[in-house]
Structure formats: C-alpha cells, structure tokens
Amino acid sequence: MVIKNHSSFFLMVLTIPFIFLLMGCPGQGDRLQLDETTQVKLIGDNICFHITNARNYQPAIISINLRGTSPKKQEFIDNPSLRIRSEQLCIPPSFYQFTDNEKYIVEFVLTSLGSAAEPRKFVVGVGLDHGQVYGFPLTDREILRPYGSIEVPE
C-alpha cells in the first residue's frame, strides 16, 4: 500500500510540470485579436469609415468583396494607396467602384507607422441603395467578436 501511494504521488508530481512544458505559456502572439467595426458614410463621392484613435495608423491591406463571396474568391490589395486623414479612411471611386443596390464586406488592417502598437483589423458591412450609403450588421461568420455579443438574424 505504501508503494502505491508513493507511485501515484510521484506520477502526479511529474505530470503537472510536463503539462506546462507541452502546452507552453501564453505569449503576446497567442492572444486572439477581435475584429473592430465602424460607421460608414458618404463624403462627396467617397465612401468613408470613421477610425477612432487613428493616431499614426495607416492601411496595410484591404479587401472589398460582395457579401457572400467565398473566402477562396476574395481579393485583397496590399499597401493600398489610401490614407487616414482626420480620423477618416476614405475610398474614392478611382480606387473602387461600388455598385448600386449591392452589399459589400469591407475588411482592412491598419498598422502603426513607427510604433510597436498592435495591428487593428476592421470589418464593415457597406450597402448602397439608390446612391445612399449605409452600414448593416454583420453575422458571426463575417466578423470575429466575442461569442453571442450581438444577435443578428441570418
């Protein structure tokens, strides 16, 4: 009996440290970054997104696709010729021509120039109806957010 108690204690003492070795400790890159969303509006002919706390962030990549486009067919533009000015990221018609009566999913990643700040990823639902721009709620398949934070009918 004494041997049995010592062997189970010995096994437990060895198991706990090895679990940490196998799993590793969570580091900065292990944290899940949730997507942000923002308001969309028409300024002149440009479709603009309000970026709070823009500081020195600028777009590193952008994707504009019709809602429902499969991930394999989505198109991305690296280092787009767009800039954030006055906390607005604006897309002129010369960059992308939005079609009336369509819904788009616009995704973009902002990186901080000259700073080690974390990149920020935005996902925005953009609709166009008879020349009027509006934002629409996204489903959990379209945006990464805390589980159950917003109920959206699909």
What are these model-predicted stretches?
Residues 50-52, 56-154:
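Acidic, low-complexity Ser/Thr/Gly/Pro-rich repeat segments typical of extracellular/periplasmic
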Residues 21-24:
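C-terminal motif of bacterial Sec signal peptides marking the signal peptidase cleavage site
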Residues 10-12, 36, 75-79:
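Short, intrinsically disordered, charge-biased short linear motifs at domain edges
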Residues 2-13:
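Bacterial N-terminal signal peptides that target proteins for export
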Residues 14-19:
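Hydrophobic helical h-region of N-terminal Sec-dependent signal peptides
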Residues 34-59:
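Contiguous beta-strand segments within globular domains
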Residues 26-28:
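Bacterial signal peptide processing site
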